[in-house]
Amino acid sequence: MSQAIGILELTSIAKGMELGDAMLKSANVDLLVSKTICPGKFLLMLGGDIGAIQQAIETGTSQAGEMLVDSLVLANIHPSVLPAISGLNSVDKRQAVGIVETWSVAACISAADRAVKGSNVTLVRVHMAFGIGGKCYMVVAGDVSDVNNAVTVASESAGEKGLLVYRSVIPRPHEAMWRQMVEG
């Protein structure tokens, strides 16, 4: 698994493809995601060692101009973050849930990483801007106090860039909502 990830989110699909090529040529990194996201944006996610990720993201951000939505370099990513992006992390029993919604994928992934590093919660999912108007959201589960802490940490993280849409903690979710949130 990669020690670090880098994310570049752009308002142009063509520019995203161009920069993806430039970033991959600039450093020894792996392409994890290269995808269109709503509404007409483009997302690049790279993995590799921290120095290479920093170089690749610098290459991308320096050439993105006004098409840059957000970027992120995240070293020592928590082991639950990538599985939460590509699917779901399982939760054994119904618990409190917390949801944090952001305006960018990079802000949400950074918030999710900080939340699970600072709280005893399970990061259930990170839904990345596909079919939801370019927004991103994360879902955590655990004891109420831990979920409250995780949501606070994540909200503060997203709020640092002004990219927090909304946050919510549901102490005792209804069974139907629980299934929808944690089972997909």
Curated annotation (Swiss-Prot):
BMC domain mapped to chain residues: 4-86, 96-182
Gene Ontology BP annotations: propanediol catabolic process
Binding residues for [4Fe-4S] cluster: 38
Induction / repression: BMC production is induced by growth on 1,2-PD vitamin B12 medium.
Record bears the keyword Metal-binding: yes
Domain of life: Bacteria
Cofactor binding: number and manner: Probably bound by a single Cys residue from each subunit; which protein provides the fourth ligand is unknown.
SMART domains, per database record: BMC (SM00877)
Subunit structure: Homotrimerizes to form a pseudohexamer; in wild-type the central triangular pore is probably blocked by the [4Fe-4S] center. Interacts with PduS.
PANTHER family listed in its UniProt record: BACTERIAL MICROCOMPARTMENT SHELL PROTEIN PDUJ (PTHR33941:SF11), PROPANEDIOL UTILIZATION PROTEIN PDUA (PTHR33941)
Primary role: A minor shell protein of the bacterial microcompartment (BMC) dedicated to 1,2-propanediol (1,2-PD) degradation. The isolated BMC shell component protein ratio for J:A:B':B:K:T:U is approximately 15:10:7:6:1:1:2. Not required for structural integrity of BMCs nor to mitigate propionaldehyde toxicity, may selectively transport specific metabolites. May be involved in electron transport across the BMC shell. Can be engineered to alter permeability of the BMC shell. The 1,2-PD-specific bacterial microcompartment (BMC) concentrates low levels of 1,2-PD catabolic enzymes, concentrates volatile reaction intermediates thus enhancing pathway flux and keeps the level of toxic, mutagenic propionaldehyde low.
Name of the protein this chain belongs to: Bacterial microcompartment shell protein PduT
Record organism: Salmonella typhimurium (strain LT2 / SGSC1412 / ATCC 700720)
Source species taxonomy: Bacteria, Pseudomonadati, Pseudomonadota, Gammaproteobacteria, Enterobacterales
